Amino acid sequence: MLASLGGLVSCAAKVHFKEEGNAMNELIANHDFDFRQLVTAAEGQPVTDTFQIAKAFGKRHADVLRALKNCHCSEDFRRAHFCVSEKINNLGIFDKKQIYYRMDFSGFVMLVMGFNGAKADAVKEAYINAFNWMSAELRKYSESYEAERNAIMLEYMKEKDVASMSGRLLNRWGKIKKPQLLARIGRLEQHGQTVIPGLTN
């Protein structure tokens, strides 16, 4: 849920993936822009924002914000699936803060539900495919990360056990085995130097 992102957030975290998948290539070929640029990842989930939606649907950003404001959804839903943020628009001498909203898939569906027309429906379908693509990429990324992490942790535990065993063996050698063996060697050397009666000249 986007509620976990807090109130005003920078929303800067992104995950970038290699290009792959015929479905996404076909999706891009049917439109004037790459939908993968319109769905990003934040806090481990696919998200989009009102700027991206305005671009995709050919609307003014102010109109998208108005549509979001007019969404008939509960405050709990709004808090869970939308997060407000701001960016600085460089306007020369004056810099202006501009409010926008980032949302997850549920928030996206709620917002664009009222966008009508054949073109809007085509964009909705492509956007949904883009969300699904990003979700799949995030799952693969997470699974790869967990597999690598588990392998490293296993190697760490093995090396730790070896080091611990080596330490115990070194301690046993220094305190027990080494003194015992040196004592036996000493006794053996003394025994070798003993003059046996009857063998002397």
Swiss-Prot record:
The lineage of its organism: Viruses, Duplodnaviria, Heunggongvirae, Uroviricota, Caudoviricetes. This is Uncharacterized 22.8 kDa protein in gp15-gp3 intergenic region. It comes from the Viruses. InterPro entries: Phage_P22_Orf201_C, Phage_regulatory_Rha. To H.influenzae HI_1412.
